[in-house]
Amino acid sequence: MINKKLLFLVFALAKGVLADEEDEYEEDYNMNPELENPGMFKHVDWRDFRLEFVILACFFLYVFSFITQKKKNQKIASRWYGSLQSSFRQQFAQYGPGPNSSPIIYDSPTEFSSYLTGRLNVKNVYTTLQLFPRQDLLAYSLNQIVEILLGNVMSSVLPVADRFQFDLTLADQNLKAERFVFAIVHKDCMRILREIRYDLSFTRISSSPYLPETHVLMSENNECSQAIFEIPEFMSSINECIENLEYFIVTDQPSVPPATEKDYVTKPRIEASIRIKKITSLSGLSNATGSALFNSLLLVADSCPKFQWRPEVSKKLTSARKLAFEQVVHASAAKAAKKKVKSSGDISKLSESDQKKRMERERQRKMRRRAKKM
């Protein structure tokens, strides 16, 4: 009985304490009107969105820069090609892809091109104006860092820059002219071009009294080099653009290493590139170097059909091309044989029924090929 009374007393005390705490909590809650009806943005401050503001500012800055710098590249291309237009139209019957279209072809925000045809000794000319990606701040910064820290020492391609390139193909009637490889290359581009261009593997590197210390001569034979250097007005035109000249290549061999004999296509042509340095303003943009390089290409194109080498020189050049073709054929055959051995090994791992099915498919494929030939 005493225990029951004691338990009842403890229960009553506990209930009283809890009731007092609830009353106190209700009073505190009612005393704070802000907690009674808190608004959605009552406690939101602009400083809580500082990161978002920074991200939006960077985004709008990027968009603004992309639009303005893209227009700047277009203005540079228009001014550059416009200043060369008179020379192009004077030398060629057609400037641009068609009579009713713009002569400047927009390939990308950083690349513009054009086309020339209709001239003696020249089949066609493709020109390309590659501009630095000014519209992309991130790419621009990364390229600047690479240029400063590494330059083109660790790169397998020419560094991104403002440059103007020519790709001139000689006319078909010049296909029987003497074949050779000749190049004037800037020392900064020599290693890269030697690695990526197949045709320059035919040449030897040497210095020349005709060239400054910044450039080297890459040629198959001294007689070929001397013939080009002695073309009237050629050296005067080259010297006008030599400061910006990256390479001037006369070749008949493919620039990309041929994988098979079908890829080994010879085409007499002249390729050249100049680097446009420090475009600070459109008003100060000059294309004197572009005009000089263009004139140099035409002088060589007109002289190539007239070149005649001594018999021993012609024999040496012909032997080098025959050997190169045989090496390509041999490498292609070795690759095909290796692939065939691998295929035979794969067949041997199949079951007998699968081997028969595969052999039957091969037999049917050969029969269809014969039927097409007939």
From Swiss-Prot:
Query: Listed GO molecular functions?
Result: calcium ion binding; protein folding chaperone
Bias-annotated ranges (Basic residues): 364-374
Q: What positions does the record give for glycosylation?
A: N287
Q: Which domain of life is it from?
A: Eukaryota
Extent of Basic and acidic residues compositional bias: 349-363
Q: How does it sit in the membrane?
A: Single-pass membrane protein
User: Looking at the record, which segments are called Disordered?
Assistant: 335-374
Write out the transmembrane intervals: 49-68
Main localization category? endoplasmic reticulum
- Quote a single Gene Ontology cellular component term: endoplasmic reticulum
- What are the subcellular locations of this protein? Endoplasmic reticulum membrane
**What InterPro entries does its record include?**
CCDC47 (IPR012879)
Q: Name one GO biological process term.
A: protein insertion into ER membrane
Q: Say which family it is in.
A: Belongs to the UPF0674 family.
What is the name of the protein in this document?
A: UPF0674 endoplasmic reticulum membrane protein C2G5.01
* Disulfide feature: none
Keywords in UniProt for this one? Endoplasmic reticulum, Glycoprotein, Membrane, Transmembrane, Transmembrane helix
Which Pfam family, any one of them, does this sequence belong to?
CCDC47
Q: What is the lineage of its organism?
A: Eukaryota, Fungi, Dikarya, Ascomycota, Taphrinomycotina
> Is Acetylation there in the keyword field?
no
